[in-house]
Design a protein with these regions (language model features):
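Extended hydrophobic blocks
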Residues: 2-188, 278-344
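A structural signal for short, hydrophobic/glycine-enriched beta-strand patches
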Residues: 172-329
Length: 344
């Protein structure tokens, strides 16, 4: 009897410790998301979709662990519970340290992303996958599944990941594009921000960059915007994206005084951060139109919501084939899900 009581106390202590670690992981992730984007945690908003996802999956895990402790027909496996918990926490710590320490890496690019960014996404995604694995394992255990438990947990975790990507894919169709006629009639001094895109050999704008810049040119000529803000840095050995776009606009007859240029940002996140710090906070500009390709607009809006800035979006006239459209939307779905969960 005494031994049984000790076992119960030990299980409760371990369960409590695991729940505390899961809560600390969640808090740590929230702090990282805002700190990494140079935002104060005071900007935290639980209604933000990504923050809500973080909370929901952590709560599911906590509830399952609590049920696992009290469900008498389930064998309490301390080693497995601690193994999952430690794996999650260590991967999260490693991912955050990788971002903070900035270890020197070769200047390689994988799927249009630097090696550093690619590793960063892999590390944080590994944390999330282990969390899904933990959730699946506990859920199946509570359902008294015994055969191929780990295999089924892996399959379920992959299924959860795919469902989230499908949800992100569907969300790409939910972007609200600005009503240009309404903006023109209000006669506000809007600034059109062109997000950078690839530069092709001989410092030529890629179709995406040219199309975005053409749309800014069109809006300026129609009087919908008063200034064009170009953004985008550069890869080694080429002009920055914004410089190429600047040259492109000058050749089309736009006056230099109508163009602002930024040459350091290297991602959509950095460009939205630039909009917040430079245009909204430093220049006190509130009327902003962000110009990009149609498949990109939803992620822009989600990032702006995270940064708590109000913008309007306009799609470029870029035309892509069905295969390229699926490729771009799939890539954007992954990027959107990664931003939701980790603000990367």
């Amino acid at each position: 009897m005494l031994r049984a009581n000790r076992d119960i106390k030990s299980k409760r202590l371990i369960t409590s410790a695991i729940i505390v670690v899961i809560i600390l992981d969640l808090i740590s992730l929230y702090f990282f998301k805002y700190k990494n984007q140079h935002l104060s945690i005071s900007n935290f908003d639980l209604s933000n979709k990504g923050n809500l996802f973080n909370l929901i999956f952590s709560l599911i895990l906590i509830v399952e662990i609590f049920l696992y402790l009290h469900y008498k027909k389930t064998k309490y496996q301390t080693g497995i519970l601690l193994g999952f918990t430690l794996s999650m926490t260590l991967i999260l710590i490693l991912a955050q340290l990788f971002v903070v320490i900035k270890i020197p890496l070769p200047n390689y690019y994988i799927l249009d992303h630097s090696l550093r960014d690619f590793i960063k996404v892999i590390l944080f995604s590994s944390f999330q996958f282990v969390q899904f694995l933990f959730i699946s394992y506990l859920g199946l255990s509570l359902l008294r599944t015994k055969e191929l438990l780990f295999t089924r947990s892996i399959v379920n975790s992959i299924a959860i990941s795919i469902l989230l990507l499908i949800y992100a894919f569907i969300n790409l169709y939910g972007s609200k594009v600005a009503d240009l006629n309404e903006i023109k009639n209000k006669k506000n001094n809007y600034v059109g921000v062109v997000l950078g895109a690839a530069v092709w050999p001989k410092n030529m704008p890629s179709p995406s960059l040219a199309s975005r810049t053409d749309k800014a040119y069109e809006l300026l000529k129609k009087g919908i915007i008063k200034k064009i803000q170009l953004t985008g840095g550069h890869a080694p050995g080429e002009m920055s994206e914004s410089e190429v776009a600047y040259k492109y606009l000058i050749n089309k007859g736009i006056k230099p005084d109508d163009i602002w240029i930024e040459k350091r940002t290297a991602s959509t996140n950095e460009q939205i951060r630039f909009i917040k710090s430079n245009l909204v906070e430093n220049k006190n500009i509130r009327n902003i139109i962000v110009i990009s390709d149609s498949y990109h607009l939803k992620r822009i809006q989600e990032i702006c919501n995270f940064f708590n800035i109000q913008i309007k979006v306009v799609a470029s006239d870029l035309s892509v084939g069905s295969e390229n459209r699926i490729y771009h939307k799939t890539k954007e779905s992954i990027a959107l899900a990664v931003f939701w969960f980790f603000a990367l």
